[in-house]
C-alpha cells in the first residue's frame, strides 16, 4: 500500500493504466496462444449458461425478478472463470481499444486480435454445444431443461435489429464495467466478488451477450432439429413452434447486431470513456 493511496486497492487512474497494459499484452501475445485461450473462454461462458438454464428451469412459481436474479448470479460464474483463469473473451477483449488510443498497438493488431478471439470463442461455444447434446442433458426434468433452452433461444432471435444492438450495448457496458472493477482488486476474492452483481444485472435484465449466444442459440437449434419424439411429447410442444430458430436467423437477427452493440458498449462507453478521463492527458503530454 503506497503512502499516497490509503486504500488497499487500485484507484481509478491506476485501473485505467492496468487496462492499457492488459490491452498491450493481449494484442501482442502469440496468436495461437490467444486462440486457445479464446476457445477456453467460449467454453467458460457456455458453462455459465448451462448453470443459468439449470437454475431457472422449474422456477415458474417464483416471482419473475427473483428467478432472473438467481439465474444472473449463476451466470456470473462464466466471467469469473475467464478473469481468474486468464481466458480471452471477446466482449472484454474490446477493452484493448484503450491500448490503441494510447498509441501502444496498431489498428492491425487490434483487428487481428478481435477476429482471433471472436472465432476462438465461437469454436469453444460450439464444442460445448456438441458436448451438452451428447450428454442428453436436454431431457433433464422431463425435458423442461431443453424446453427452457428453446424458449430462451427463440426469444433471442425475435428482436429487431435496433433492439438487438441496444441490448448488446447494455450487456457489454455491464460486462466491461465488471472487468474494469476487477482491475482494482488485489486478492482473488476481490476480483471474483466485484463482478457478480454487474453480470447478474445484465443477465437478469435480458441484455444480449454475443459469445453467450454462440452457445445458447445453436443449442436451441440443435434441440429443435434433432430432439427425439419422446422429448416433444414430454414437453407438450413441437419443432414448428420454434420455426424461427435457424442458423441464418441466428446470424442476421442476433449475432451481427449484438456483436456491434457489444463493441460499442464495451469499447466506447467503458474503454474510450475512461481513457479520455484518465489517460488522454498523460498520452498528450
From Swiss-Prot:
Name listed for the protein in its UniProt record: Formate channel FocA
Consequence of substituting residue 209 to Y: Increases intracellular formate levels. Reduces intracellular formate levels
Catalytic activity: formate(in) = formate(out)
Keywords: Cell inner membrane, Cell membrane, Membrane, Transmembrane, Transmembrane helix, Transport
Observed effect of gene inactivation: When both FocA and FocB are missing, an unidentified system can transport formate.
InterPro entries associated with the record: Aquaporin-like (IPR023271), For/NO2_transpt (IPR000292), For/NO2_transpt_CS (IPR024002), Formate_transptr_FocA (IPR023999)
Induction context: Part of the focA-pflB operon, which is induced anaerobically. Transcription of the operon is restricted to the exponential phase of growth. Expression is subject to complex transcriptional and post-transcriptional control. The tight coupling between FocA and PflB synthesis ensures adequate substrate delivery to the appropriate formate dehydrogenase (FDH).
